[in-house]
Amino acid sequence: MKYDTFLLQAQIWRKIGHLSHAGCLLAFAVLFPFFTWLLHFSYTRLERRRGKEKPEFAWKSWQQWLLAGGILYGCYLLLLIACYPGFYNYDIGNQLPQIMYPEVPFTAHHPLLHTIVGGGIITIGYHLRSVDLTFGVFLYNVVQMAVCASCFSYAVVFLYRKTGNRILAVLSELFYILCPPVVMFAMSTTKDVTCYAFLLVAVLKIYQIYADLNAQKFPTVRQWITTGILLCLACLLRNNIVYVLPFAAAFAVFCTSCRRKQQILFWIVMILAPFVLNKGLMAAVDAAPGSAAEALSVPFQQIARVYVDKGEAAFTQEELDYLYTCINKEDFAMYDPVIADAIKTAFWRHLDVIMADKGKAI
């Protein structure tokens, strides 16, 4: 599998990473308002449909969810059998030994929750059928597809109950069944899949909470707790999700005055809970902390891009002397504008130099 979709392979998107400063500003000036308008249009249209929301449905919401989820899961299982055992890819190869072999220490380099759960399921499958990892990978994908089907069908039912539009609901269901990247990633052993499945439902729950607040209704404790659990799961499955929470909190509290104290309490808990829970997991399995290189992948990639585009002329001699202690000069040839892994690894080899004088590195 590739990181690229057919859309990202288009040359127009490839060139964005090589734009001049003015070009970047122009791209931002065009794309940011467009996507902001698109989100605003979608949510305001959904809000207008609330007046057409049916007070009664022939089926209860959980029955609709079971039907949509059952159809989706059945289709996913057929596709998984056709592609048996699914895709064993990305970071799970580094995570699995931590579960399978006692002599391999745990590390928080990758999300521990995914290491424990994902590695545990594959290990169980391996012990059930000890020929190779095939059955374990299949078992993992069976579980992951159940999570995806549950979350995606919740989104379909949410949309249907908000709009009452059966055609829109059917098209949404077909999208989750027929869109190749969605189906392929649903059977891929990567943390991103379950993370964004939980995040999808969390976003819909947050939408419902703030729609109620704007209508001067009071969300129940159950709504807050359910949303919090989903957000925590997303954060524990993908470390960088937590970075957006302070910005989301500030924006939400600033724009919505109703029950502001309740909002502030919720967002404070949400910012702290993933950190505390992750520390608890690290203590429970005696895991070593993750590398700081993970958090620095964006500036590493930016430095490499400037070096590749403009060469040594873009740096002073003092900067170059220090830069070559942080990364081997020939490693800049590994720069890829699409993914930062190669450059991140090159800097990671000399991370002790960077961490020894953080001020100079900054």
Which residues fall in each region the model found?
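Transmembrane-helix motifs of polytopic, lipid-linked glycan transferases
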Residues: 33, 142-163, 201
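Extracytoplasmic catalytic/substrate-binding loops of multi-pass membrane glycan-assembly enzymes
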Residues: 83-97, 104-121, 127-135
